[in-house]
Regions:
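N-terminal mitochondrial targeting presequence
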Residues: 1-30, 34-36
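Hydrophobic Val/Ile/Leu positions in short beta-strands of Rossmann-like dinucleotide-binding domains
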Residues: 47-48, 73
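Conserved glycine-rich cofactor-binding loop
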Residues: 51
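N-terminal Rossmann-fold NAD(P) dinucleotide-binding loop
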Residues: 55-56
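Conserved N-terminal Rossmann-fold NAD(P) cofactor-binding segment
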Residues: 70, 74-110, 125
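N-terminal Rossmann-like NAD(P) cofactor-binding module of classical short-chain dehydrogenase/reductase
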Residues: 114
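Rossmann-like NAD(P)(H) cofactor-binding subdomain of soluble oxidoreductases
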Residues: 126-192
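Long, compositionally biased stretches enriched for glycine and/or charged residues
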Residues: 196-342
Length: 342
């Protein structure tokens, strides 16, 4: 037994040496990465309304996701913007992104401008009144951002997002493809989570969208939904499912959250950050976002590939007769609302 000790000692020493060399190599690679990151000019993302819950959640999500950008928190309430920016910057010391308070003029020269500012709908308030109030807010923001960088992309998050995206495009002067809205991206995520619970399949492997006008006139594209390359509704666990109940659950989700804690912001924050990341990194990923669909003649929550130039392409979606009827209702509602602000 004694004659094996030198071999054991040698093996232990060799193992320690290899671990030490691996650690040195890891540190060198990290330092090289940090050096390379330092030479790459950071892109800028500005969050308008960053002093509020949705804006701050969006800014934090950008940092937490490791997006290598300078994130500016901009708000008419300067103290709120400063507080949120300082708090979020504390989370950036191990991440490639940075965060600070910014001005509207700086925001106008950003690569991506995310708008989360806007008035909330009051109990019993007609939707038309909310649009009127937010029209004035969005127009004021666009005036404050001027001159806007010609290559900038605007991401509208404020509601009613379909109409406000249209207003932002008209008042900013940017091409339609460079102005989009968060639309039904979050609603589609909620849908996929519910379907994942039913089928046992990861939500990332379920392709199903909420479409149309974000809000009352949105609908589920059941006939185009897929799972594993096959129609979703052919999945064995979907045979006896009440589709209307799923739709109602998606529609009620925000109200349940608002009733419990006052407002929603984490979900939409991560969605907005993901869309901004796609715009910055030219990912060409497909999202159900508000984009101008030529065949509809209006902005609409519809699947589109997103890249550094904004909307790269919008897709045709297979609909049945009932779904197409809901689509036409949504188109008419959006066009009617937008026509008042031409």
């Amino acid at each position: 037994m004694l004659h094996t000790l030198p071999k054991l000692i040698y093996t232990s020493q060799l193992s320690s040496l290899l671990r030490a060399r691996a650690l040195i190599l890891t540190n060198k690679l990290y330092n090289v990465k940090q050096s390379l990151m330092a030479t790459i000019p950071k892109q800028r993302v500005s969050v308008i309304g960053g002093g509020g819950n949705v804006g701050a959640s969006t800014a934090f999500a950008l940092i937490a996701k490791g997006v290598p950008a300078e994130v500016l928190v901009v708000d008419v309430v300067d103290k709120a913007a400063e507080g949120q920016a300082l708090d979020i910057s504390d989370a950036s010391f191990m991440m490639p992104g940075t965060c600070r308070k910014g001005s509207f003029k700086e925001a106008g020269q950003s690569d991506v401008i995310i708008i989360t500012a806007g008035a909330r709908q009051q109990p019993g308030e007609p939707r038309s009144n909310l649009i009127d109030r937010n029209y004035k807010i969005i127009k004021s923001i666009m005036d404050s951002l001027q001159p806007i960088k010609s290559s900038a992309k605007i991401l509208m998050v404020s509601n009613p997002v379909d109409v406000l995206t249209d207003i932002a495009q008209k008042t900013s002067g940017l091409p339609r493809k460079q102005v989009i809205g968060s639309g039904t991206y979050l609603d589609s995520g909620r849908l996929r989570n519910v379907l994942s619970e039913i089928t046992g399949v990861s939500p990332t492997s379920i392709h199903a969208y909420m479409l149309g006008e974000h809000g009352d006139n949105q609908f589920t594209g059941w006939s185009s939904a897929r799972i594993g390359g096959r129609p979703l509704l052919e999945h064995p666990k979907m045979k006896n499912v009440n589709l209307d109940e799923i739709y109602e659950k998606i529609q009620r989700k925000a109200y349940v959250i608002i009733d419990a804690k006052g407002s929603t912001y984490y979900g939409i924050g991560i969605c907005a950050a993901t869309l901004a990341e796609a715009l910055l990194n030219n990912t060409s990923q497909v999202f159900p976002v508000v984009n101008y669909v030529d065949s509809f003649g209006c902005y609409m929550s519809w699947p589109a590939a997103i890249g550094c130039d904004g909307v790269e392409q919008s897709f045709d979606v297979k609909l049945n007769k009932e779904e197409d009827k809901k689509l036409q209702t949504a188109i008419a509602a959006i066009k009617d609302a937008c026509s008042k602000y031409d």
